[in-house]
């Protein structure tokens, strides 16, 4: 049997296995099987105690040494979508296969690939950009983020990643972000965060359902926030709403004729993350929180989630435990909580005399002039400048100082128009796809005070 035949057989058998598992679980629920006989629903303890007999795939008992070799070949061979779905299918066969995939499939920061759902909230690659594009639907006030599969952005469908829906309110505008393209709402199981603006459209706050490394300090600084115990909230709904970023647009005296000036304060990313040896702490292990993931997890590969199944988030810890431990530790107990957040600013464009417009070098990724186009780089702080002066005075290694300066000058996020309701979005470390998408959504909002 060929290698690809093995992969197809594993994927097909896994799909039929998950369907049988789902039918067994549904038939065991009183009131849903049609034989409740007037009785009320049983307790969750009774439901968990009931054994579920499911047929196992014949590939579950594959020797670990052979399985690891198969996974390595699959990881190297199926490096791009849509063929990369075979890696996702193999990771969902059983716990043994999943653990091996966790060891072989690296994070986007290292490999530069988006494989599992949790990759959407992990930092991008340090070397190079992950190229994406955004489709806007003005009639439905929705925005869809896709992963570029080829250089032809206008003619490809891409790999769906995230969706956002704009909700207008009396004093603000809210963008709901979800991994479910068909049900974009806070009540959806695919809800991963939101972005809210003020009335003038000059200030924005990005909220995440996942707790960052400094969740305790963020929630304590949030004005009027109320902490709700995760045990008192429905476990199927996300309980966290952490303000991880603030985006501010400054007044533009030239109006629509001049470039926008924006500043992004990333509270979930320390300023030291852009240093050569810097890291982004507190990276999530799962995309969607779910305390009942072991009892109600559906392993169907044809899930209604448009990106990938939530059962492949690779986490054994519950969201309530993570958030609880973050809230129990005070700001004094966490040294990282006092570290300065990363600040991003837009790269200043230059005026082109012949074209009579402001220009930025997007390296062919942006083709239509628009006030929405921007490039973000790390802002130079006073402390980092003093540190560089001290390094020069002490005559330290010139290579390390030049490397640090180059890292601060790299474009971390760029966004621009390429056609009608079509925009490109390219991001890199230390931003994640979710953070980059939320920042780009601020450019779509109407800015009464800036234009």
From Swiss-Prot:
Tissues expressed in: Ubiquitous.
Organism: Oryza sativa subsp. japonica (Rice)
Source taxonomy: Eukaryota, Viridiplantae, Streptophyta, Embryophyta, Tracheophyta
Protein name in the entry: Tubby-like F-box protein 12
Stretches for region Disordered: 387-407
Domain F-box: 57-112
Signal peptide, first to last residue: none
Entry-linked InterPro entries: F-box-like_dom_sf, F-box_dom, Tubby-like_C, Tubby_C, Tubby_C_CS
Compositionally biased intervals (Low complexity): 387-406
Domain of life of the organism encoding this protein: Eukaryota
Family: Belongs to the TUB family.
């Amino acid at each position: 049997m060929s290698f690809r035949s093995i992969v197809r057989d594993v994927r097909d058998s896994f799909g039929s296995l998950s369907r049988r598992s789902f039918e067994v679980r549904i038939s065991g629920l009183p009131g849903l099987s049609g034989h409740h006989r007037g009785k009320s629903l049983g307790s969750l303890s009774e439901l968990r105690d009931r054994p579920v007999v499911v047929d196992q795939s014949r590939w579950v008992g594959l020797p670990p040494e052979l399985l690891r070799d198969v996974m390595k070949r699959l990881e190297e061979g199926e490096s791009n979508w849509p063929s990369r779905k075979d890696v996702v299918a193999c990771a969902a066969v059983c716990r043994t296969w999943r653990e091996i995939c966790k060891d072989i499939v690296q994070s986007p920061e290292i490999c530069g690939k988006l494989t599992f759902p949790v990759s959407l909230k992990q930092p991008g690659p340090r070397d190079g950009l992950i190229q994406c594009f955004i489709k806007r639907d003005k009639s439905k006030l929705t925005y869809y983020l896709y992963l570029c599969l080829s250089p032809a952005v206008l003619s490809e469908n891409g790999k769906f990643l995230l969706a956002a829906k704009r909700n207008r309110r009396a004093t603000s505008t809210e963008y709901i972000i979800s991994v479910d393209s068909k049900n974009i709402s806070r009540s959806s199981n695919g809800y991963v965060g939101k972005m809210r603006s003020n009335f003038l459209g000059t200030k924005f706050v990005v909220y995440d359902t996942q707790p960052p490394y400094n969740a305790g300090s963020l929630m304590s600084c949030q004005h009027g926030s109320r902490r709700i115990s995760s045990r008192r909230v429905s476990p199927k709904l996300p309980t966290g709403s952490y303000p991880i970023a603030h985006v501010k647009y400054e007044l533009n005296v030239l109006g629509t004729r001049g470039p926008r000036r924006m500043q992004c304060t990333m509270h979930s990313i320390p300023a030291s993350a852009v240093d050569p040896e810097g890291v982004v702490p507190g990276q999530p292990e799962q995309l969607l929180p779910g305390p009942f993931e072991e009892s109600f997890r559906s392993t169907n590969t044809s899930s209604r989630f448009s990106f990938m199944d939530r059962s492949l988030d690779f986490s054994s810890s519950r969201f309530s435990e993570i958030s609880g431990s973050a809230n129990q530790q005070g700001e004094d107990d966490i040294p990282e909580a006092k570290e300065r957040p990363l600040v991003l600013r837009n790269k200043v464009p230059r005026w082109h005399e012949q074209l009579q417009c402001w220009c930025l070098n997007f390296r062919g990724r942006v083709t239509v002039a628009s006030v929405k186009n921007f490039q973000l780089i790390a802002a130079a702080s006073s402390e980092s400048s003093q540190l560089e002066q001290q390094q020069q005075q002490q005559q330290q290694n010139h290579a390390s100082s030049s490397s640090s300066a180059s890292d601060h000058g790299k474009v971390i996020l760029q966004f621009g128009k390429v056609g009608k309701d079509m925009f490109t979005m390219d991001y890199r470390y230390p931003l994640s796809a979710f953070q980059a998408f939320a920042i780009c959504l601020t450019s779509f909002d109407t800015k009464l005070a800036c234009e």
